[in-house]
Amino acid sequence: MREKIRLNSSAGTGHFYTTDKNKRTMPEKMEIKKYDPVVRKHVVYKEGKIK
């Protein structure tokens, strides 16, 4: 089953992306480099829960 997740910026800007992932095939926490428009550069985004 695909679950919705939130990708939080590690730059501390409060910016986030929402996406989904398959928990069965990828049980570990997701970390991916994406663009943060607040600091205008690519930073690591880490998985967090949607509240």
UniProtKB/Swiss-Prot annotation:
Residues 1-24 are annotated as: Disordered. It comes from the Bacteria. GO terms for molecular function: structural constituent of ribosome. One of its GO terms (cellular component) is cytosolic large ribosomal subunit. InterPro entries: Ribosomal_bL33, Ribosomal_bL33_CS, Ribosomal_bL33_sf, Ribosomal_zn-bd. Belongs to the bacterial ribosomal protein bL33 family. HAMAP family: Ribosomal_bL33. PANTHER family: 54S RIBOSOMAL PROTEIN L39, MITOCHONDRIAL, LARGE RIBOSOMAL SUBUNIT PROTEIN BL33M. This is Large ribosomal subunit protein bL33.
